[in-house]
Amino acid sequence: MSSDAEMAIFGEAAPYLRKPEKERIEAQNRPFDSKKACFAMDDKEMYVKGMIQSRENDKVTVKTLDDRTLTLNSDQVFPMNPPKFDKIEDMAMMTHLHEPAVLYNLKERYAAWMIYTYSGLFCVTVNPYKWLPVYNPEVVTAYRGKKRQEAPPHIFSISDNAYQFMLTDRDNQSILITGESGAGKTVNTKRVIQYFATIAVTGEKKKEQQPGKMQGTLEDQIIQANPLLEAFGNAKTVRNDNSSRFGKFIRIHFGATGKLASADIETYLLEKSRVTFQLSSERSYHIFYQILSNKKPELIDLLLISTNPFDFPFVSQGEVTVASINDSEELLATDNAIDILGFSSEEKVGIYKLTGAVMHYGNMKFKQKQREEQAEPDGTEVADKAGYLMGLNSAEMLKGLCCPRVKVGNEYVTKGQNVQQVTNSVGALAKAVYEKMFLWMVTRINQQLDTKQPRQYFIGVLDIAGFEIFDFNSLEQLCINFTNEKLQQFFNHHMFVLEQEEYKKEGIEWEFIDFGMDLAACIELIEKPMGIFSILEEECMFPKATDTSFKNKLYDQHLGKSNNFQKPKPAKGKAEAHFSLVHYAGTVDYNIAGWLDKNKDPLNETVVGLYQKSSLKLLSFLFSNYAGAEAGDSGGSKKGGKKKGSSFQTVSAVFRENLNKLMTNLRSTHPHFVRCLIPNETKTPGVMDHYLVMHQLRCNGVLEGIRICRKGFPSRILYADFKQRYRILNASAIPEGQFIDSKNASEKLLSSIDVDREQYRFGHTKVFFKAGLLGLLEEMRDEKLVTLMTRTQAICRGYLMRVEFKKMMERRESIFCIQYNIRSFMNVKHWPWMNLFFKIKPLLKSAEAEREMATMKEDFERAKEELARSEARRKELEEKMVSLLQEKNDLQLQVQSETENLIDAEERCEGLIKSKIQLEAKVKELNERLEEEEEVNSDLVAKKRSLEDKCSSLKRDIDDLELTLTKVEKEKHATENKVKNLSEEMTALEENISKLTKEKKSLQEAHQQALDDLQVEEDKVNGLIKINVKLEQQTDDLEGSLEQEKKLRADLERIKKKLEGDLKLSQESIMDLENDKQQVEEKLKKKEFEISQLQTKIDDEQVHSLQLQKKIKELQARIEELEEEIEAERASRAKAEKQRSDLSRELEEISERLEEASGVTSAQVEMNKKREAEFQKLRRDLEEATLQHEATTAALRKKHADSVAELGEQIDNLQRVKQKLEKEKSELKMEIDDLASNIETVSKSKSNVERMCRTVEDQFNEIKAKDDQQTQLIHDLNMQKARLQTQNGELSHQLEEKESLISQLTKGKQALTQQLEELKRQLEEETKAKNALAHALQSSRHDCDLLREQYEEEQEGKAELQRALSKANSEVAQWRTKYETDAIQRTEELEEAKKKLAQRLQEAEENTEAVSSKCASLEKTKQRLQGEVDDLMLDLERTSTARAILDRKQRDLDKVLAEWKQKLDGSQAELEAAQKGSRSLSTEIFKMQNAYEEVVDQLETLRRENKNLQEEISDLTEQIAETGKHLQEVEKSKKQVEQEKSDLQVALEEVEASGSLEHEESKILRVQLELSQVKSELDRRVTEKDEEIEQLKRNSQRAAEAMQSMLDAEIRSRNDALRLKKKMEGDLNELEIQLGHSSRQVAETQKHLRTVQGQLKDSQLHLDDALRSNEDLKEQLAIVERRNGLLLEELEEMKAALEQTERTRRLSEQELLDASDRVQLLHSQNTSLINTKKKLEVDIAQCQAEVENSLQESRNAEEKAKKAITDAAMMAEELKKEQDTSAHLERMKKNLEQTVKDLQHRLDEAEQLALKGGKKQIQKLEARVRELESELDAEQKRGAEALKGAHKYERKVKELTYQAEEDRKNILRLQDLVDKLQAKVKAYKRQAEEAEEQANTQMSKCRRVQHELEEAEERADIAESQVNKLRAKSRDVGAQKMEE
């Protein structure tokens, strides 16, 4: 567990992820009684903590923490884990695994806000209901690249593990985030996406933003997709404020390097019913309330809405605000996400408009018409707003809602709707618009996230709506809960089955327990054939089905038969329920009201048609692919045998299909599970409801995991780890000094400990423990450590005290010695002779000391050099060791990948074998068909024979008829007429026969064409098979190279094991590895542990080397001190030289005195001898030390040489193993070639069978030709038979025969049509097989690319190792040169020192001469050895140069081969791409031609319509002009009236007093009012006409736009051709990349050569070591000789390889020629494609000219149509005539039959008369017969001529019928156009008539007004005259008054 310092990288999140170190220490030191601490069951809190007070029998008394005393059964009390397991991060590591331990661990971690906890393989998270700082950027950085055990539990850790697994295992991953609604799934999903977007950034430069667009990077877009989907797909529910009301599976795609490549989102089951209905405590989707928040006021104005949610019933049925959500800020985030995701401004406005329109839909009101069932709109204001936002005509929309058009049979009728039906229809349309808009947004986001970058793997994140139990549960809840049921079953199967499979894999005895089947009953109840969904879909098929019938069927089928289906028992006050299902998470009551309508999801097709024509592009696009009942009917009539179209799929069927796809995706990935828990129902932070959490734990499978832990062995440790950790429990069980396998050691260790054998099991690689045993072993280990530490401390203390005592004693003895010596010295200190001795002694010993110093210095320098060399060798070996370890690891990874590739290859081989079996089955079927054809042929031969028999019988009949001709003299004319009629009938029958034969021939030709097409497809399949074989050969080559790498890896394994000193055991492990994969894994892990031990040893050696380096430094310092002393000694020596001469004189004087005092000096001489003996002893010790040092160095050299020899032997062994494996590889290749030859033989046999089929068909055609000849013969016989028409009975017999022949031919025709259908079916099967082969080819190419990438990575790693080795060799060379230069310098210094010593010390001349002679002899031996070494080096250099030349040639050849192979592959790929492109271009050309013809037809119709419209416009303009003129006249009359009115007003002002004026004024006002009404009416009519003209203009504009869109389509096709060209250029770039790969392979071979050179350099180093020792030199010479032998063998092998490469070079040159031919072919095809492209462009340019030509052709076609109509009329008349003649012939036939009978009777009478009449009568009759015969011949000639004329006429009739058919088609097409135009003309005429009627009414009104105006004028004149009269009277009266 990490320390606080290590947790500092997590920043402020550290305390929320792992408990601090202080708390951990306190927990470990806390007093704990494991026998008393427990958990007890409690009714209130489920489980409580307590202490056991007592136990009696099966009863336990427990005292809880709140001072309660409980008496419980023993099975209700559970032991508590030690304190160190408190808040443990992985609950599977607990000592005691049970429910209360899991519950309290989660609770305590939740109380500390550690919301993530591991539970074995998956992670459990608890919703905190508050923000925690655990998702900050520093946390993301801290978790990056961390293993699971290295960091605390977190969703980031799960994500990073999935990412690392994806990169290492090269497998797709998935993260399944499941839990109940409100558990925090959506938040965790966002965090996972945040993590991937942060750690796997693409690394590309940001794209330049387009003006007007704010488009982010791929990471930003992936992150911003979530807010947008949440706004439109999340809503507040009872349990969750931000509940996802749809499921999503987000796939994040990565490239081969782990960088983000792209992403896509799949959504499931959007809850669209929430758009129109919410419960009281819920609300609709967030986007509605975000818009209403008024954060963007422009949206309020744009959508014509208010800011009050209660104004819109669709969004205000529940709550409208959520405390935890700021709708204003969320709106800005949503708007920003739309911009970042690249939506255009038009699309953005369309989204908002449709959202506002959905809100307006809820305000639309309808009412019932009086006395009718019909509904009508209650106001149109809301509909106008909705229509404006959706780009619709509101009146048409309301009409479509109230009176939709329904198809009844083949006609459309208008159906009346009541208010409820209209309301339901409005809600369904609102839901459909919202759902389709949401799905379109998802598709649009996927388009934006698809960057077209290469992607290798993906990580899928699943966020599905959680399990839901509401008061009212409908179909949506059933689908959601069923999804969770399936996911839970997947989880159970994956977690528990894998756990048990590991037991079986490890070889543990285990009875398999299937936990995954616990949910099968509920799943089958829902989805089985007679399950709930099946019954629901069946009911939807019946038109009269109701919810009640659906419920009754459910009860009949499941009630009482399935335990999971129950009758509900709803509590009072809750919603009604119809049935209950027992899910894994609880029992749910479902209400089936409206399920049938929800499942069928019907829409008002009339309104949908308006949507398709909407001016809002987004809305029209959403419903462009909608197919209603009409489309369904038409589709059904065409393809009645197929399934219903997608538009007829029910909601449940679509849901199940998507769910099955999801489960398939999940099964193909490696899943990682995250289980989200709800702590409480009140959303209170920090509070945990025990019952609720336990219910979820039981449902989510956490407790099942505990159950399998109880039964199984949850704790497991590798054998090596167990041995290392628990060896302390009984060290004597594992003997020291000898190697013992970790498994055996673990078995011995456990058997020696007092542990129950049932508590553990031994696997192949691990030891498994029951729950709790590992904790017991830990306690035993702690106790053992305590005792050992106590004992060790006592021993250490005793040892330290003994050392201290020993030092004290040594100090005491040394003090005594010093005291004695000082006393003795003080006694002789002042003795004269002592002074003399002090002076002479240094002089005597100085020369000898100098010699000793020189020798010591030489020895020191030599030892120093040897130490440096040994250090260099040690470092080199260490580097080699590291490189070998690295290569071993790389090869292990490569072996894993190779085994996977081998498995893939085996699977592909099995697939080929299966395809072979299928081909054999097809061959068998063809043989059976051949037999059937032979049977048909035999039947035809039999029929032919029967016809021949019939012909012979007819001939006989004809002979009989010729005999009877002489007897029909009197009835000649009648018989001739009858013969003519019958001959015409026969010709008609023969024509029918000829028609049937022609049809038969046409069917045979179609049959032959189908067979030819089948042959072509089979040839294509054979070509694909050959290509597949080539690719498989390439993959075999790659696999061979990878197998070589495997061999190298195995060899390196053996080298490593030899270095470890256990070669025999390693070889056995290798054999086990080849026999058993599981043992391989165990041995690998064991060896990895041993490698770690070796690594520790190497570390120890490094530490030792550091110590030696320190000693070397100390010795260097000592040497410097000694050199300083030598310098001081030299100075003193110079002084001594001066004093020597003085002393020599004094010596002569003293010698005389010494002779006198010889007795005194004898004691002194003895002392000198003693001192010399001591000095000699010290010298001997020094020499022994130097000899010992040399011996150790020699031993080290010998050991190193032995190790090198062993390595050489190992390399030899590896070479032999490599050869053996290459032989095996060649054998495998031979087997593969055999398989390929078998496949070729099968294909050849298939072609032979097809050839036989063709020959049989040729025979069949020949037989048919013969049959035709026979029919011709029959025709001739029938012509002969026409002469003899007197025998009615035989004629009728022939007619019957003809009818039977016709029936047989029709049967044959039916058989041929059946064969044709069978051939078509086979052709479809062949195309499917071809597609499957193409898919397999694509997958094999993909595998090949993967293998190539792996090979390149391995080669790069190998290159790095080679670079490291070359670096080490260069360092060795540097050391060698340094050593040689240092040696030369030091020899020169020695010679100078020797000269100085010779000059200064004459006494040492003899010694120096001896030393010099010795040095000379050593120099001679050195030179001799150096010469031998040089010779050997020359030999080695020659061999190495030869080998280098051969290697270089080999590399060049390999490079050429690789280049040409790659070019060949690239050319093949280019050829295939070009062929595909040519085929696609041909199809596009064909499509363009068809489109062109359609455009011509449309243009022709549009021109005619345009012409008609222009004529109508001209008519309308004339009418408008006339009305304008009329208006001008009215205006003039109006002005006149106004003028007169003004005059009248002036007159009226004068006579206001008069009462009659008021009456006149009222009349005038009425006149003015009528005039204004007339004017307004005329203005309105004019505006309506203007609008109609505008509408016509818009229609013509739309037609022009349609033409423009077609031209745009042509431009797009041209762009597609350019894109194809770019794709081909990209293929060329890929070929260049492959060329680069081949160059890298060449570099890798060069690196291999460098390794060989490195080995040669190693041999040179061994030769250098031989200079220092004669024995070492001999051994190394022997090694070099052996190596030379090996090199000679290798040279021979290289020569053989050179010959082989020469052969391969010739083959490659031939392949090069073929490839160049193919390249030229591709180039020519490319140029032809470019030419075709130019031609297409020219054709497009000529389209406009051809359009005008087509107009002329259309006029000609009209004339032809008229002619065809007349011809058709004539043909109809002729047909009628022919029918009349046939009826007449029928009547004649009946008459002839009667006359034949009469003639027969008369003939009999004539025969009797002839017998009686005699010879004269016979002669007369004979003459008469002759005349009749001549007349008959003439009549036959005339009949033949008539037949010829009839045939000619028939041919003419056929030609006319064919032309009439073509003309009829043209006429029909023209008639359709005419009908359309006539309908339009009628409409326009109707409008014109209405306009004329209105104009007439206006004119009548105008005339009436004019008439009234004239009357008013007359009245005004009368009034004026009266006024004048009154004025005159008034003047008279005034005059009279004046006069008076």
UniProtKB/Swiss-Prot annotation:
* Coiled coil start-end: 843-1940
A single Gene Ontology biological process assigned to it is: muscle contraction
Q: What CDD domains does the entry give?
A: MYSc_Myh13
Start and end residues of each stretch annotated as Disordered:
1886-1940
**Which residue ranges does the record annotate as region Actin-binding?**
659-681, 761-775
Top-rank taxon: Eukaryota
Keywords for this protein: Actin-binding, ATP-binding, Calmodulin-binding, Coiled coil, Cytoplasm, Methylation, Motor protein, Muscle protein, Myosin, Nucleotide-binding, Thick filament
Task: Tell me the GO molecular function terms.
Answer: actin filament binding; ATP binding; calmodulin binding; microfilament motor activity
Where is each Myosin motor domain found?
A: 86-782
Any one of the GO CC terms: myosin filament
Report residues binding ATP.
Answer: G179, E180, S181, G182, A183, G184, K185, T186
Q: Basic and acidic residues composition bias: which ranges?
A: 1929-1940
The Myosin N-terminal SH3-like domain, residue ranges: 33-82
Sites bearing N6,N6,N6-trimethyllysine, chain numbering: K130
Q: Which InterPro entries match?
A: Kinesin_motor_dom_sf, Myh13_MYSc, Myosin_head_motor_dom-like, Myosin_N, Myosin_S1_N, Myosin_tail, P-loop_NTPase, XRCC4-like_C
Q: Where in the cell is it found?
A: Cytoplasm, Myofibril
Q: Where is the IQ domain?
A: 785-814
The entry's function note states:
Fast twitching myosin mediating the high-velocity and low-tension contractions of specific striated muscles.
Subunit field text = Muscle myosin is a hexameric protein that consists of 2 heavy chain subunits (MHC), 2 alkali light chain subunits (MLC) and 2 regulatory light chain subunits (MLC-2).
**Domain comment text?**
The rodlike tail sequence is highly repetitive, showing cycles of a 28-residue repeat pattern composed of 4 heptapeptides, characteristic for alpha-helical coiled coils. Limited proteolysis of myosin heavy chain produces 1 light meromyosin (LMM) and 1 heavy meromyosin (HMM). HMM can be further cleaved into 2 globular subfragments (S1) and 1 rod-shaped subfragment (S2).
PANTHER family in the cross-refs? MYOSIN HEAVY CHAIN, NON-MUSCLE, MYOSIN-13
Entry similarity comment: Belongs to the TRAFAC class myosin-kinesin ATPase superfamily. Myosin family.
Q: What is this protein called?
A: Myosin-13
Which organism encodes this protein? Canis lupus familiaris
Taxonomy of origin reads: Eukaryota, Metazoa, Chordata, Craniata, Vertebrata
